[in-house]
Amino acid sequence: MLDQVCQLARNAGDAIMQVYDGTKPMDVVSKADNSPVTAADIAAHTVIMDGLRTLTPDVPVLSEEDPPGWEVRQHWQRYWLVDPLDGTKEFIKRNGEFTVNIALIDHGKPILGVVYAPVMNVMYSAAEGKAWKEECGVRKQIQVRDARPPLVVISRSHADAELKEYLQQLGEHQTTSIGSSLKFCLVAEGQAQLYPRFGPTNIWDTAAGHAVAAAAGAHVHDWQGKPLDYTPRESFLNPGFRVSIY
């Protein structure tokens, strides 16, 4: 099933690129929480929803662009968790650092994940405890790697005081910044060793990247040391967390 989901992410990426390259208008509007949404978000959402309903008609889908109410979700044990365009701010800035995120959740755990970066044409995927990166038609297994000093990857759009204080106390390290779920993927492929997050995220922002990072050997825990959990709950918000090889 992983190959079909990867193809679905590519199809969604193609829909996004039609807007990104100007073939179709961007049509930026603000949602209720003041976050931006574009025609590309909606186009990718439609592609993925249609594809998953065909692929697994009995498995419900939670997408950022049309999340079902709590009364619908509360008893879900297995479901798809989708962010059709993760990094909308990066998309609007046209820096290429945005992704299509698709994850399969089973009893609170992301057991399959796909993160596709359309501009870079790079696909990260994970299933059955293994993670892969596909680039230029070549697919290879990836895993975490230690480095000294460690490289810490941080958000390009969400710096905050807590993060600055954490980095000051961390000891010797280097930092790099990148948008969207690519932060999880840098840890997964051994380029970075730590991704700390204090600012707000939603479950669809993290599930696919979580699957990839965990399958590559990283730990994805909240600041109390518990694994991020995707068991349905009323709020879509995650606690703060860190993705680490340590």
Curated annotation (Swiss-Prot):
Q: What happens when the gene is disrupted?
A: Mutants require cysteine or sulfite to grow under aerobic conditions.
EC number assigned by the record: 3.1.3.7
Q: What GO MF terms are annotated?
A: 3'(2'),5'-bisphosphate nucleotidase activity; magnesium ion binding
* Activity regulation text: Inhibited by lithium and calcium.
Name the catalysed reactions: adenosine 3',5'-bisphosphate + H2O = AMP + phosphate
What up-regulates or down-regulates this gene? Strongly repressed during nitrogen excess.
What positions does the entry give for Mg(2+) 1 binding?
A: E64, D83, L85
Any one annotated GO CC term: plasma membrane
- The entry's keywords: Cell inner membrane, Cell membrane, Hydrolase, Magnesium, Membrane, Metal-binding
Which Pfam families does this one have?
A: Inositol_P (PF00459)
* Primary location class: membrane
BP terms from Gene Ontology: 3'-phosphoadenosine 5'-phosphosulfate metabolic process; phosphatidylinositol phosphate biosynthetic process; sulfate assimilation
Per the record, membrane topology reads: Peripheral membrane protein
Span of the secretion signal? none
Instruction: Provide the binding site for Mg(2+) 2.
Output: D83, D86, D205
Tell me where in or outside the cell this protein is found: Cell inner membrane
**CC cofactor:** Mg(2+)
**Amino acids binding substrate:** E64, L85, D86, G87, T88, D205
Please state which protein family the record places this protein in: Belongs to the inositol monophosphatase superfamily. CysQ family.
Task of the protein: Converts adenosine-3',5'-bisphosphate (PAP) to AMP. May also convert adenosine 3'-phosphate 5'-phosphosulfate (PAPS) to adenosine 5'-phosphosulfate (APS). Has 10000-fold lower activity towards inositol 1,4-bisphosphate (Ins(1,4)P2).
Q: Under what name is this protein listed?
A: 3'(2'),5'-bisphosphate nucleotidase CysQ
